[in-house]
């Protein structure tokens, strides 16, 4: 009787449809801060879920961090292929209840969390949000017609192509 009970208990255990690699070849983080482009973010996530098949990621991992509810919280999710369900799934890895996309320390912590939660040999970062070209976040919002012509069309020597990104009030400079 005891052997039969042990056998039944072993058979009832569900086998996971996804086993993340201990060390992925590559982890890609899609970081989409802010709320003003939320419909586009949702469309992007759905597109990724459609693209993730049983072979799409190989030994890699796909993370998405976005702010679906408001400007002060964020969620980091992994999109993966579940071989039992035969479709892509999204799993929340971490939630941020007090997140400021304009705070370099908060964004740095988010990147560190991604590396800890999905360790990899290589990392990729995709940022999807508003950007201000080479204007720093402190430059405010200026219509192009108000800027001097050479400030609009000529980058400062040694400047990176993008200097800041994010929603108004939540911009972050790239240094």
Which residues are covered by each model-predicted region?
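C-terminal motif of bacterial Sec signal peptides marking the signal peptidase cleavage site
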Residues: 7-10
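Chitinase-like catalytic core of GlcNAc-active glycosidases
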Residues: 105-175
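Sec-dependent signal peptide recognition
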Residues: 1-4
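N-terminal extension/subdomain marker
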Residues: 12-120
């Amino acid at each position: 009787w005891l052997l039969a009970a042990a056998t039944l208990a072993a058979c009832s255990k569900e086998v996971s449809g996804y086993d993340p690699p201990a060390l992925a070849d590559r982890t890609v983080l899609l970081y989409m801060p802010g709320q003003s482009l939320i419909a586009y973010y949702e469309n992007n996530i759905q597109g990724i879920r459609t693209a993730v098949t049983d072979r799409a990621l190989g030994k890699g991992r796909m993370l998405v961090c976005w702010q679906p509810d408001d400007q002060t919280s964020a969620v980091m999710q992994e999109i993966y292929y579940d071989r039992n369900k035969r479709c892509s799934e999204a799993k929340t890895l971490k939630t941020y209840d007090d997140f400021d996309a304009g705070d370099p320390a908060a964004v740095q912590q988010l990147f560190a969390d991604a590396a800890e939660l999905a360790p990899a040999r290589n990392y990729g970062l995709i940022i999807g949000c508003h950007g201000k070209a080479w204007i720093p976040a402190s430059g405010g919002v200026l219509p192009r017609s108000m800027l001097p012509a050479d400030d609009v069309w000529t980058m400062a020597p040694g400047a990176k192509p993008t200097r800041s990104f994010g929603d108004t009030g939540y911009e972050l400079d790239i240094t």
